Amino acid sequence: MARSFKRPDEAAMQRVFARTSGGAAEVVLRLAWLQGLHRAEITALRWDQVDFAGRALLLPDRTIPLDPSAEACLRAWYVRCAGNPECVAVSDRDQTPMRPESVSRLARQALNSEGLALSLLDLRRDFILRQIEAHGWSYAAQVSGVAAAALREEFLPRLRAANTLPEAPKVGRDEREYLLWRIIQQEGSSPAGLALWM
């Protein structure tokens, strides 16, 4: 049986973004829904991991292309948070780093204001589903940091039930491609990493 996921209504999310425009809640929600970050990744995100020139988030285990609206939001937030040049998730009031519980509470309040009974995890799952539907299993594995096999186990029944399966999953190829990508990410510019790139 397919596990049911709570998926946000896009129009409702746009209303939430408009209501929270320019604040910490908008940043948190965009990082979860448009970039697929976990709560722990949101609270740990530093400005040196936000590559505006390369339009990407550079996390320790993966690189995530920046959604244009998330990029615009982060650029405005960067200017506003000049008082805290390190941490991205800071409070509106005093620009101090937010605790994980505060991030969840802020997101829940913003989502509830539009009648959306969702969590940050629901937003991340929706991000992953959208990546699978739009780009396939391998790409979704790369940007989510979840192995393709684990993605298939969790999301394949849901996609089949919704009749939105993008392609038949290629178990061997996708998994090998993802594992090679992870090794290259971990090795970086080491001799082994450079050899793999060649």
Task: Label each region the model flagged.
Residues 1-14, 60-69, 82-86:
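DNA breakage-rejoining catalytic core of tyrosine-based enzymes
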Residues 28-29, 40-45, 140:
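Alpha-helix N-cap/helix-start motif at helix boundaries, enriched for small hydrophobics
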Residues 137, 144-177, 181-185:
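Catalytic-site neighborhood detector that most strongly recognizes the C-terminal catalytic loop/helix
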